[in-house]
Amino acid sequence: MAATLPLSPINHQLCRFGNNSLTTHRFCSPGFLISSPCFIGLTGMGSATQLRARRSLISSAVATNSLLHDVGATVAVLGGAYALVLSFESLTKRNVIQQSLSRKLVHILSGLLFVLAWPIFSGSTEARYFAAFVPLVNGLRLVINGLSISPNSMLIKSVTREGRAEELLKGPLFYVLALLFSAVFFWRESPIGMISLAMMCGGDGIADIMGRKFGSTKIPYNPRKSWAGSISMFIFGFFISIALLYYYSSLGYLHMNWETTLQRVAMVSMVATVVESLPITDQLDDNISVPLATILAAYLSFGY
């Protein structure tokens, strides 16, 4: 039998209820159990077993809480994404905004809002997959409409260039796949996914709007692109990338050396801008070329 230490009057008062297991657990800390008669009826092995059981219960409770948290976050983000597209569908239907502007605003906002919503998910390792479920559902919706299985004319009109259902299987589908890929493989701990989505959503999206409005002077090697669009892509892509990195740094997910980060992001933005300006759109959609080029450049710059 393990030796016990003398008890103070307070010890006696706390532990005289030792026959009641509930009271013992409440008033006798692990320290008391080791050195006092509160340990009546328990062996060292029994105490260790109880501690393991408690840890198991706590772990199960935490896992359940994380699961419910992530399910709720998924529902909220999915609802927000649907509401965003629905609102622009309505605006396009009522001719409040042009189809081309509606498409680009959806392009800009849906991806950036998705990235901004990542912190509402839990800290579990499975949280990224719950987040990725949102673009997965939207991708399935695009496939269903793109194959004309259940076409939604307003969706087609609001997110395509020419209003054809098969267009949903190109740029828009590549777009949601880029969101899914960034969430699963980079998530909140890497600047790579954030920068790639900033360039694809913000930089490329704003480049198109500015190019249409101010793009009279074309780039010599690609008459479909303008200096105004390319300059806008570099500037807005750079600042949106920095804003996202600062956002995640302030929340404690990233730890950046800002002097080198500014230089690296500028370099990545330049690479993405040059790739977007190349005359390869007919062969490779911007929603593939821009995120791929950005991911490669960001990986070479940041290394994680």
From Swiss-Prot:
Broad class of enzyme this protein falls into: transferase
This protein's record includes keyword Repeat: no
Transit peptide residues according to the UniProt entry: 1-59
GO molecular function, one term: phytol kinase activity
Keywords of the record: Chloroplast, Kinase, Membrane, Plastid, Transferase, Transit peptide, Transmembrane, Transmembrane helix
Listed transmembrane segments: 71-91, 105-125, 129-149, 167-187, 191-211, 227-247
Catalytic activity: phytol + CTP = phytyl phosphate + CDP + H(+)
Protein name: Phytol kinase 1, chloroplastic
Organism: Arabidopsis thaliana
